[in-house]
Amino acid sequence: MRIFDAQKRQKQSRFPMKKITKEVYLKWYEDMQFWRRFEDKLAAVYIQQKVRGFLHLYNGQEAVLAGSLHAMDLEHDKMITAYRNHVQPIGMGVDPKAVMAELYGKVTGTSKGMGGSMHIFSKEHGFYGGHGIVGGQIPLGAGIAFADKYFGRKGVTLCYMGDGAVRQGSLHETFNLAMLWKLPAVFICENNGYAMGTSVARTSY
């Protein structure tokens, strides 16, 4: 087991850590408040049956997105995640109205109303979904990173997953290839403690 020493790693890094000022903290708080209210509104209209299909909210996980967005270069970096994917594209620059329209099934949505809650997508903003299969986005994230490396493009791919995805074989296979090929990818596990309903304490790995 390797112990991660952030200070030592920072001294060795080619990329200096961004300073976190009071203004940055306030921006994070503002973003997180907006994202929470956005999700709460979706929950309300879902109960009213105005949004069809499934609805997986991001409530309680906003800080992960706020912090990781701060480290990103939005001009070159890319993002891919699972089915809790309503607010990430907003953080990447997608118009919130387009995200809401997608959940309402309108042609003005990010996927022309055909993707729905779990399939928000905007290549123009470097956001590659929203995927309904548990762990399905993990090898795709590696593929996006591989394409950038192969074509000599700048950028890092951030691939988010929940704790339920770590039981998928594709995760371990992807991690192995990402290390062997030295892919420009960051894999982030957002452990909410329950995956979709099973406590981590009752889960076998």
Model-identified regions with their sequence ranges:
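Hydrophobic alpha-helical segments at protein termini of multi-pass membrane proteins
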Residues: 26-29
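Short, ordered loop/turn segments at secondary-structure junctions
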Residues: 84, 190-193
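Short beta-alpha connecting loops at secondary-structure transitions
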Residues: 193-199
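Cofactor-binding active-site loop characterized by glycine-rich and histidine/acidic residues
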Residues: 40-43, 50-181, 199-205
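Short, proline-centered helix/strand-breaking motifs
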Residues: 183-187
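Active-site flanking residues adjacent to catalytic metal/cofactor-binding acidic residues
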Residues: 162, 189-190
